[in-house]
Amino acid sequence: MNADYKIIHYGLIGHPLGHSYSQAFFTKLFEEEKTAESYSNFDLDHLDSSTLDALVNGDPNLAGCNVTSPYKEAILPFLASLSPEAAAAEAVNCLRIERTADGYRLHGYNTDIRGFALAVADMTDRLDHGQGALILGTGGAAKAAAVALDLRGVPHTFVSRTHRAADTILYTDITTEIIANNPLIINATPAGMFPQVDTEPSFPYSLLDNRCMVFDMIYNPAQTLFMQKAAAAGAEARGGLEMLHIQALESLKIWRNN
């Protein structure tokens, strides 16, 4: 083997990572493309400068990482730059690692935004003028969904378990009128994600009907309890696997163009 030969490494930062399909997706892709690239899971029980230094400095061939829960917002203080999309979302799911003479610099991106936008494009196209979306959750995934909806001119309201704000209501505030005005409902919470498959958002499913569309950003399991209950009420229900694939390929474009 050529002494200059090296395998470029990527990975996923988060905790826990038992639910993730990313490693399997990228491994299969690299095998099919016959490229010298690999992808690993980096399950970090905490995130600080020391854990990042150990990760990045410990592998000189590590060129980029995806970031998942609970670190999409916690990673921000450690970044040298943010893409405009990531800055708008105040959340990052993709890191590009720049090697420098004195160490490294981390650059943050948000490919969830494009992944979500494309995965729900036909749903947003079916909204009547003035209709909007309810985004369940207020974390990094919810912020990415909000930016994507803003770019498509779709009004939206966050739904929280604990606090109200100018753009946020409680689950107990949801009424038939609110659903009629916001027939697209997005689950951007981890409720229902493997292994906690018996959990769900505290949503009033009885208010849904066949005019409603729900999108769950979770992809494991393929049919969450949220989706099952929404479908039983008559709503169209879709999971997040297509979004996962799109954001993964968008991340790979960023890393390969490094």
Where would I find each of the regions flagged by the language model?
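Active-site capping/gating segments
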Residues: L118-D122, N220, A235-N258
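Conserved hydrophobic helix-helix packing surfaces used for dimerization/oligomerization
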Residues: Y10, G132-A133, V214
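Rossmann-like adenosine-cofactor binding region
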Residues: A166-R238
